[in-house]
Every structure is written in structure tokens, then in C-alpha cells.
């Protein structure tokens, strides 16, 4: 039988078969995909072949094969930094929810996420949530960040998942697509999904006052069919985002504003760090490229882990 993985709980996978029915499936033994060393060999969004288990009253299956993925979002695993975790696969676009506070989303985190989306050719849209709660100063900061990322080529939308502001814009972008929603815990992922499709009635989190972080309400990634010809993947809140398996020479290509200028560098293999006559560094000095983006680039190049607790908005 053929189907698509809608939910993964680590050991069991909920698969929607071509007949529209859901089956609880598992994998037997060491199930590894060539070229990918991840903590989860099967991910939400995977298209799989599975066999129903004989002699079992409840309809359970065993996954035999995974169809080649069109793309996936991957990051370093939480517990084992050398291992990776595939968040979801076969995605048309990803929405990254960003909040200025409660919890803060830093540019280092945003940039690492965007680099991964670029590397796997997934369209990313930045959603600045909770705009209804911000002061004039905070709204100015949102405007600054939105302009920064728009100048790098990304679509940015200010929303309020709670009062519905611009939720229709997000919904329109989802029609006909499989979309993934990501961000820190407490940025409003489940609230946004409920605003888009109230019938789902997902559990939402309260913010921990002590740490300004959201409490995890989504433990495992899960995909939902929506009533307007769309699918959405809800993902667990993530703290840091480790970039996986990229050569130093290619990292700059995943910053769109670097890529479009690199042909003007003196050296074709310019890494935009110490080389003379570098178009990226010239653009940086001229204010055409944001310092925060360049700092993120240097951190990724140096292999530094994302420190989401340190304020790095400033130069």
C-alpha cells in the first residue's frame, strides 16, 4: 500500500493511505536512508510503501520503503549534536513565526533557518506575530526587521494570530500547498493554525513568565488536511537551529543578497571574509547588506552554535 506520513511519535507513524484511511505503522530493524544520518529515518510528509500486518485485529502496518524526498527541513539533533533531525519533508513553503519578546526571536536563529530553507529550495515566508501587542518602539523594530529581510528577498507579513490580523493573507498563500509552520515555543504556531482552521482546535501554550519562553504544546510534528485544498505541518517549538552539512564555499550562496553580488568579487572562490575587493564587504560598508546578516554568516562559517539567549540585533 502507498501512503503519506501525517504524524511521527518516534516509534509509530500515522500514515494516510490512498484510500483516505489512516494506519498506525512502524519500522522494523535498522531502517536507514542512504546519505542521511538522522535520528528519525521516517519524517512527516514522507511518501511511503507499507504492508498491513497479518493476524492483527487493529489495522497496523510496517513501512517498507520511502519514496525519494523532493526536499526536507533538517537541523542538528537536540541531544546529539553530531546527529541530525528531519523536521518534515516534501514541503512547498515554510512559515517562520517571529516574535520580538515573550519569547524573543533573534536574527541569528532566523538566518540559520532561512539558510536551511534556501539550501533545500523551500520558499520561506516570515510572519511577525503578536503585532497587536507591541508598543510604538516595538512596531518600529518589526518594521526595521521586515525591511531588512525584504531587502534580502523574503516576503514578510505582520500578523496577529489572536485577533485575526492578516490571517487571510497567510491562508491565501496556503491554498494548493503543503506548508510547514515553525518557530520557538510560544510564538503562536498553534494559535495561528486554529485561526486558519478553527475546527482543528489545537492546544495552545502559555508563556513561562520566568524565562519568557513558551511551553511545548506540540511534541511531535503533525500534518493536517485543511478545508480549502491545503495541508499544514505543525512542528514542535525549537530553541536553537543547527545548520547541517554545508561546505564553507556554498554557505554564502544561501544568503540571496550575497549570491546576487558575488560575481562582482575579485576572486571567484571568495569567502567574503579576508579577501580583497569583495563585493559583499563593499555592500556591507555601503549599507546595502545588513550587519546582522553578515554576522550570522560568519557564525555559520565558523561553526558556532546558535545562541538564542543573546541579543544580537545590534551591530
From Swiss-Prot:
Residues given in the record as GTP binding sites: 129-132, 183-191
Manner of cofactor binding, per the entry note: Binds 1 zinc ion per subunit.
PROSITE patterns (alphabetical): ENGC_GTPASE, G_CP
Cofactor annotation: Zn(2+)
Entry keywords, A to Z: Cytoplasm, GTP-binding, Hydrolase, Metal-binding, Nucleotide-binding, Ribosome biogenesis, RNA-binding, rRNA-binding, Zinc
NCBIfam families for this protein: ribosome small subunit-dependent GTPase A
One Pfam family recorded for the sequence: RsgA_N
Subunit-level organization: Monomer. Associates with 30S ribosomal subunit, binds 16S rRNA.
InterPro entries membership: G_CP_dom, NA-bd_OB-fold, P-loop_NTPase, Ribosome_biogen_GTPase_RsgA, RsgA_GTPase_dom, RsgA_N
Residues bound to Zn(2+): 265, 270, 272, 278
A GO MF label: GTPase activity
Protein name: Small ribosomal subunit biogenesis GTPase RsgA
Free-text function comment from the UniProt entry: One of several proteins that assist in the late maturation steps of the functional core of the 30S ribosomal subunit. Helps release RbfA from mature subunits. May play a role in the assembly of ribosomal proteins into the subunit. Circularly permuted GTPase that catalyzes slow GTP hydrolysis, GTPase activity is stimulated by the 30S ribosomal subunit.
Domain CP-type G: 80-241
Natural source organism: Christiangramia forsetii (strain DSM 17595 / CGMCC 1.15422 / KT0803)
Similarity section: Belongs to the TRAFAC class YlqF/YawG GTPase family. RsgA subfamily.
Gene Ontology annotations of biological process type: ribosomal small subunit biogenesis
Cellular component, GO, one term: cytoplasm
EC number: 3.6.1.-
Highest rank taxon of the organism: Bacteria
UniProt subcellular location: Cytoplasm
CDD domains hit by this protein: S1_YloQ_GTPase, YjeQ_EngC
Amino acid at each position: 500500500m502507498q501512503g503519506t506520513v501525517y504524524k511521527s511519535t518516534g516509534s509509530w507513524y500515522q500514515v494516510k493511505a490512498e484510500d483516505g484511511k489512516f494506519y498506525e505503522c512502524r519500522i522494523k530493524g535498522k531502517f536507514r536512508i542512504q546519505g542521511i544520518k538522522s535520528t528519525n529515518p521516517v519524517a512527516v510528509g514522507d511518501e511511503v510503501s507499507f504492508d498491513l500486518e497479518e493476524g492483527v485485529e487493529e489495522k497496523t502496518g510496517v513501512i517498507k520503503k520511502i519514496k525519494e524526498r523532493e526536499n526536507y527541513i533538517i537541523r542538528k539533533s537536540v541531544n546529539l549534536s553530531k546527529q541530525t533531525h528531519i523536521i518534515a519533508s516534501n514541503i512547498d513553503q515554510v512559515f517562520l513565526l517571529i516574535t520580538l519578546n515573550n519569547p524573543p526571536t533573534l536574527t541569528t536563529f532566523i538566518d540559520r533557518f532561512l539558510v536551511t530553507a534556501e539550501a533545500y529550495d523551500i520558499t520561506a515566508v516570515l510572519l511577525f506575530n503578536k503585532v497587536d501587542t507591541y508598543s510604538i518602539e516595538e512596531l518600529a523594530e518589526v518594521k526595521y526587521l521586515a525591511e531588512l529581510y525584504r531587502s534580502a528577498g523574503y516576503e514578510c507579513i505582520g500578523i496577529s494570530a489572536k485577533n485575526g490580523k492578516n490571517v487571510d493573507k497567510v491562508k491565501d498563500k496556503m491554498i494548493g500547498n503543503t506548508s510547514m509552520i515553525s518557530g520557538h515555543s510560544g510564538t503562536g504556531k498553534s494559535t495561528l493554525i486554529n485561526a486558519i482552521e478553527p475546527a482543528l482546535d489545537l492546544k495552545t501554550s502559555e508563556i513561562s513568565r520566568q524565562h519568557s519562553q513558551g511551553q511545548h504544546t506540540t511534541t511531535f510534528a503533525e500534518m493536517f488536511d485543511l478545508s480549502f485544498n491545503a495541508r499544514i505541518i505543525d512542528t514542535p517549538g525549537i530553541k536553537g537551529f543547527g545548520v547541517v552539512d554545508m561546505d564553507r564555499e556554498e554557505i554564502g550562496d544561501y544568503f540571496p543578497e550575497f549570491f546576487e553580488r558575488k560575481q562582482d568579487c575579485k576572486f571567484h572562490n571568495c569567502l567574503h571574509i579576508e579577501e580583497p575587493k569583495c563585493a559583499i564587504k563593499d555592500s556591507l560598508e555601503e549599507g546595502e547588506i545588513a550587519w546582522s546578516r553578515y554576522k550570522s554568516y560568519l557564525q555559520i562559517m565558523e561553526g558556532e552554535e546558535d545562541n538564542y539567549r543573546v541579543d544580537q540585533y545590534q551591530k
